[in-house]
Design a protein with these regions (language model features):
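Histidine/cysteine-enriched polar flanking segments
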Residues: 1-172
């Protein structure tokens, strides 16, 4: 296990790095359930069609959004079968869920990215994301995965581990 005192989050606290204004600024997130393992660049994960990923990335850039991968804490389900996707509107606190089995099904999310979040299919339900992307940042796996597991014990259906969201030094 990594030395917790030598990880980036601990070093950032020692240096008194400012946290205000250093997180990623996006209007929306496109969340795509994918069991992993996630490589350093999560969207290059095995099982994700590169052509579909390119279209998702282009669509998210158009609307000031970002695509991140999600999975349930501590559980690994089949890499195939029915999985979730969602568009989360950060500004309005709204979310719209969909499902995919084939990579082409994810293209529906491109249209949803442009929708008004006050429309049909959108809800105020919570989604709690905890970065656990250890190949991108060790802190996220070492500190994030236990946090996600503890939260999932209390908030069973709303907690997800996620790939790196951007903005470093926030690990628990």
């Amino acid at each position: 296990m990594a030395d917790l005192d030598d990880l980036c989050a601990a070093r950032a606290r020692e240096r008194s790095d400012p946290l205000i204004g250093t997180a990623l600024h996006v209007r929306r997130f496109l969340l795509v359930e994918h069991q992993g393992p996630w490589p350093f660049h999560a969207l290059e994960s095995e099982g994700l069609d590169p052509d579909v990923v390119a279209r998702l990335v282009a669509a998210t850039r158009e609307v000031g959004a970002r695509t991140i991968l999600i999975r349930r804490p501590g559980r690994r389900s089949e890499a195939s079968g029915r999985r979730a996707w969602a568009v989360a509107d950060v500004e309005n606190g709204r979310i719209r869920w969909g499902a995919w089995t084939d990579a082409a099904d994810l293209l529906e999310a491109c249209a949803v990215l442009r929708e008004d979040s006050g429309g049909p299919g959108w809800s105020d339900e919570a989604a709690v994301l905890v970065c656990a992307h250890g190949r991108h940042d060790t802190c996220c796996a070492v500190r994030g995965r236990p946090v996600a597991a503890a939260l999932a014990d209390r908030l069973v259906d709303v907690v997800w581990e996620c790939s790196h969201v951007g903005g470093d030094r926030f690990a628990a």
